[in-house]
Amino acid sequence: MSGLYLALRTLHIVSATILFGTGLGSAFYLWMAHRSGDPRSIATVSRHVVIADFLFIAPAAVVQPLSGVALAWASGVDLLASWLVAAYVLYALAGACWVPVIRLQIRIRDLAGVAVAGSRPLPPAYRRCIAIWFALGWPAFGAFLVIFWLMVAKPDPW
């Protein structure tokens, strides 16, 4: 194995770990804050989740496909291999879920912040946002699990 291949593979694995791990951790903490019902907790956690999105998830989301294509090219894998095409589609699905989730998390942060500042309960808009956020998380999570399997198994489904 060449040094380039090992560097690309390491970059790809590390960025996948950051993307999946930070996403899962952020979802867990925001969901637990929501379950507490405490606007202060929700405001604090959602503020940190939004920061984590921009510091960790966004860069990893860019590095992931770039390092993946470079890794496939460096290892001589056909970029249109069926398992890679399936991974591309699933990655696009996860991204299509993640983009609105970013906006929802910003809205959740803002709604909770206003509730805390005004010593008021969370408004109905908060409940709508968290419900949509929760619903969008599942297909993205499932897509990433299947992508991990595709990267390891490299099956030839068609």
For every predicted segment, state its role.
Residues M1-W158:
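Polytopic transmembrane helical bundles with strong interfacial aromatic enrichment
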